[in-house]
Amino acid sequence: MEKMLLKSTTRHVRIFTADVINNDLVFHPNKLTLDLDPDNEFIWNEDSLKKVNQRFTELVQERAGKSLDDYELRKIGSEIEGLIKYLLQNGLLSYNPECRVMNYSMGLPKTKEVL
């Protein structure tokens, strides 16, 4: 029986049980691929990207030996969403004003005028 590619999708995080080969997702039972902020809602700097990728790696390593099922993928995606919100609320990440749709999905920006 052929294995099926699993994915977990949140607003800003997509995780696949796949490897990227020639820009295509190819099922891999022991590999996770992260697609971060597919709608370009945020402006990312190297430090923020590093923090997210490092946390993703930690979460994957914590699950070494466990089945990569829908539940585990959703837990990882939720953790990464929480980190993105933390980065945004602490000024380490900002909304992209040129995003296709400005909906402030993680809350309104905090500015001195609002505080």
Swiss-Prot record:
It is an enzyme of class 7 (translocase). Its main location: membrane. The keyword Phosphoprotein does not apply. The keyword Signal does not apply. GO terms for molecular function: oxidoreductase activity, acting on NAD(P)H, quinone or similar compound as acceptor; quinone binding. It catalyses: a plastoquinone + NADH + (n+1) H(+)(in) = a plastoquinol + NAD(+) + n H(+)(out); a plastoquinone + NADPH + (n+1) H(+)(in) = a plastoquinol + NADP(+) + n H(+)(out). Transmembrane segments: none annotated. Its EC number is 7.1.1.-. NDH-1 shuttles electrons from an unknown electron donor, via FMN and iron-sulfur (Fe-S) centers, to quinones in the respiratory and/or the photosynthetic chain. The immediate electron acceptor for the enzyme in this species is believed to be plastoquinone. Couples the redox reaction to proton translocation, and thus conserves the redox energy in a proton gradient. Cyanobacterial NDH-1 also plays a role in inorganic carbon-concentration. This is NAD(P)H-quinone oxidoreductase subunit M. It comes from Prochlorococcus marinus subsp. pastoris (strain CCMP1986 / NIES-2087 / MED4). The gene is ndhM.
